[in-house]
Amino acid sequence: MEEYQVYLKLHRSRHQDLLYPLFFRESIYRLAYGHGSFFVENVGYNKKWSLLIVKRLITRMYQQIDLIIFANDSNKNPFGDSNKNFYSLIILEGFVVVVEIRFSLQFWISSLKELEIVKSYNTLRSISSIFPFFEDKLIYLNHESDIRIPYPIHLEILVQILRYWIKDVFFFHFLRLFFYYYFNSTSVFTPKKDISISFSKSNPRFFLFLYNLYVWEYESIFLFLRNKSSQLRFKYFRVFFERIFFYEKIEHLLEISAKDCLYTLSFFKDPFIHYVRYQGKSIFVSKNTPLLIKKWKYYFIYLWQCHFDIWSRSETIYLNQLSQHSFNFLGYFLSIRLNVSVVRSQMLQNSFLIQIFIKKLDTIVRILPLIRLLAKEKFCNILGHPISKPVWVNLSDFDIIDRFLQICRNFSHYYNGSEKKKSLYQIKYILRLSCIKTLARKHKSTVRTFLKRLGSEKLLEEFFTEEDIFSLIFPRTSFTLQRLYRDRIWYLDILFRNDLVNHS
């Protein structure tokens, strides 16, 4: 029993009065700067929000007494007019900024480093670290499931999830009040089914925080079931979904199992299940039989329906055999291929041939999604023909070339794990010619004239390495050279996907 408590026990040091001490005192600054200068900016979000701005916003919140005292005019919507709606957004942004500090990845890692738990963290957190794991494990597994995580869920469920982390009762009352007024004012103009979509667009930071919180709760329950898979009957499976009084329920179930049930409640660890999530999808691979895989499928559906009140159909989870199925993952097209090797064996005067089948993971980069991405960013048209980038014409020649080279390096860095580099070479060619056309347009010259003046080999060396040029000129070389130039290299310093490779 103690082993289960270690896994799902809430960190009491984290479960504390969080928001009110931070909002109504200035301990937010001590908390933020006490764990290093990680709170600088959020990549991919509006960078105008900083700690200093939040301090000013909280100061302005103190001055808005009519936002805090709702009892004076209970019939009036405090978030109704535009001015008060602006201050409600201030409160919402301040809330998210404060909570992000507490839930920040660097905040947790700083605590782990003090305990010397994480030593090679920067390598493990790389999104490319999953591919070497796939190369080692995927070839021994049989089944793969594509899971589409259902969303959105009812906001009251998200408030209940926050109860596991925050003890501020007044904050939950305020959060429910905010949701009530926001959705009532929005539903007048927006259909019910589109309210969550409009909410995600108007408050992307808060929406992303709630989504990550929901996924974290769903995965924490699933990982417990994965590590300690239960042999309970289906009707008893539901009791594990509610985290409150979790351990008392386990003890109660053990008593029931020993006295009234014909079977015993036991837990076993299944080492052949692997789970990976990316964006709004997840991959579930296993070596189990099809019957056990279907059992896990309905466990997922039951979890979403009973714990999160989300109606999910069985079609949201697809079951496939790895030997007959290929799937997309983080920009790569993955499949299991059988390599046949013929070995001649001789015993005394008899010789015979032996065929050896070896499974291998294929990692292929498809060219069409990359061309669509470059076309969207105005580097080429939809057919892949390079065009100039007119918005960069006002930059200096050095800045134009540097920007194109940086994009090219990003592609090479990210997709260097591909076994076949032809798609990557085509992308480099498009970027190189787009760079030349942009420079020619800036100097009001033709491409041919500009290349004569610059030198045709000048930009070729910048965009293509020596082995790239060699493989393009001599596509059919010896097996040793092909293996040298086509080996997969996974860079373990990629912490997030660049916009120009985020095409899935």
From Swiss-Prot:
Record key words, sorted: Chloroplast, mRNA processing, Plastid, RNA-binding, tRNA processing
Cellular component GO terms, alphabetical: chloroplast
InterPro entries, alphabetized: Domain_X, Maturase_MatK, Maturase_MatK_N
Keyword hit for NAD: no
Subcellular location(s) per record: Plastid, Chloroplast
A family per Pfam: Intron_maturas2
A single MF term (Gene Ontology): RNA binding
Chief place of localization: plastid
GO BP field: mRNA processing; RNA splicing; tRNA processing
Family: Belongs to the intron maturase 2 family. MatK subfamily.
Chain's role: Usually encoded in the trnK tRNA gene intron. Probably assists in splicing its own and other chloroplast group II introns.
HAMAP family the UniProt entry points to: MatK (MF_01390)
PANTHER family on file: MATURASE K
Protein name, entry field: Maturase K
Annotated organism of origin: Erythrina crista-galli (Cockspur coral tree)
